[in-house]
A protein has these predicted regions:
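Extracellular/periplasmic ligand-binding regions of membrane signal-transduction receptors
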Residues: 61-95, 116-128
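Extracytoplasmic/periplasmic ligand-binding sensor regions of membrane-associated signaling proteins
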Residues: 105-106, 119-195
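Solvent-exposed, extracytoplasmic
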Residues: 93-105, 193-229, 234
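Membrane-proximal alpha-helical signal-transduction linkers
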Residues: 320-344
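Short, hydrophobic beta-strand elements of compact beta-sandwich sensory domains
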Residues: 175-178, 187-197, 258-297
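Extreme N-terminal signal-anchor transmembrane helix of membrane signaling/transducer proteins, especially
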Residues: 1-43
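Membrane-proximal, non-catalytic sensory/regulatory domains of signal-transducing membrane proteins
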Residues: 144-181, 216-219, 240-275
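Cytosolic-side ends of inner-membrane transmembrane helices, especially those
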Residues: 13, 26, 30-31, 299, ...
């Protein structure tokens, strides 16, 4: 019974050692590989943010450039009256639309250019080319541009059918407003340059289409913290995504956060444009980032189970091989007499040399 107890102890010791080694390796493997995957994913998301920011900034700079060029063009100043004021009429349409198109360039830096006077008229050129009375829907932005005296005013994405011929579907635009000044730097009107959102956010849209379900979530917030991409979603969904902006307030460009939508752990990378003030937030769930680790762990678990089975067999054989000589020696000692120690005695118990 005692020999069995000794064998059991040895067997458990061997098995415990094997399990400790295998478990330590599994923990190290998980910690090391998951860390590498996390760092790699965050680096990739930072690269994505940089490319998104570069493309969007370029689109906004193009709108800005067209606006500035119109403001400083000598040809645009010829439409002013003798008092150097702007009074839009249909006679200006042909010349000014040609000017706007030429300043926009062959790349169509702006899809639509509008020039407003302070009498309630607008000259439109681009997708829509017309002179008409304004409807007052843009008075807020016109007034904001007047107050900033030449500085740009960026609108959030807005939906309109104003420039669609059939008026049966919506288009999303971003506009840049700037005051239009005469030769004496006095504001006499407002310039609006507009671009469709699908062009402004082209790089993000292309990335999402190419990667489908594997694509990271991309959110863009303006300097006020309002969500501007994705733009064509419901107000309820926008409100649900708003907490993401609060979670990004900090010094780190790489974050680990809990999703406001699902509560799951997510990895995020952010970038802020000094030109537009936009914050780009790219997010990937931890379960997606660590999916390769989980797959490898399943393979590792099968290998560990195999090694453990082999270890059990080897441990059993080793424990028996150690206990057998001890048991043998025990029987020899039991057959020896204390007073005959040192004398050779013949026994029936076979002794191997």
């Amino acid at each position: 019974m005692k020999s069995r107890s000794l064998q059991s102890k040895l067997f458990l010791a061997y098995i415990s050692l094997a399990c400790l080694i295998l478990f330590s390796f599994a923990v190290f493997f998980y910690a090391f590989v998951s860390r590498q995957l996390k760092d790699s994913q965050i680096s990739a998301m930072n690269t994505l943010n940089s490319s998104f920011q570069t493309q969007v900034d370029s689109a906004i700079r193009n709108l800005d450039a067209v606006s500035v060029n119109i403001n400083y063009s000598n040809q645009s100043k010829t439409i002013l009256d003798k008092s150097f004021n702007l009074s839009i009429s249909s006679d200006m349409l042909s010349d000014m639309s040609d000017l706007f198109i030429s300043l926009s360039g062959t790349e169509l830096k702006a899809d639509q250019v509008n020039l407003y006077d302070f009498s309630g008229y607008v000259l439109e050129a681009g997708i829509s080319t017309i002179v008409k009375k304004t409807d007052g829907s843009k008075d807020e932005w016109i007034e904001a541009a007047r107050e900033l005296e030449g500085k740009k005013v960026l609108t959030p994405p807005y939906c309109t059918r104003e420039y669609t011929k059939s008026a049966t579907y919506d288009q999303w635009f971003i506009s840049l407003y700037r005051s239009f000044n005469n030769q004496y730097k006095r504001s006499v009107g407002v310039i609006e340059t507009a671009k469709q959102c699908k062009s402004v956010f082209k790089s993000i849209i292309t990335y999402k289409k190419k990667n489908h379900e594997d694509a990271a979530s991309v959110y863009v917030f303006d300097s006020n913290g309002d969500l501007i991409y994705p733009y064509d979603i419901s107000q309820e969904y926008k409100a649900a995504l708003q907490p993401y902006f609060e979670l990004t307030k900090g010094d780190d460009s790489a974050l680990t956060l809990a999703s406001p939508l699902s509560g799951r752990t997510e990895y995020a990378a952010e970038a802020v444009s000094s030109y537009t003030g936009y914050t780009y937030l790219t997010i990937q769930p931890e379960s997606v980032v660590l999916a390769p680790v989980y797959n490898l762990l399943r393979i590792l678990a099968a290998i560990v189970a195999l090694f453990l089975t082999v270890s059990i067999f080897i441990s059993y054989r080793l424990s028996r091989s150690v206990v057998k000589p001890v048991k043998h020696l025990k029987h020899i000692i039991q057959r020896m007499e204390l007073d005959s120690l040192g004398q050779e005695k013949v026994t029936a118990y076979p002794v191997s040399v």
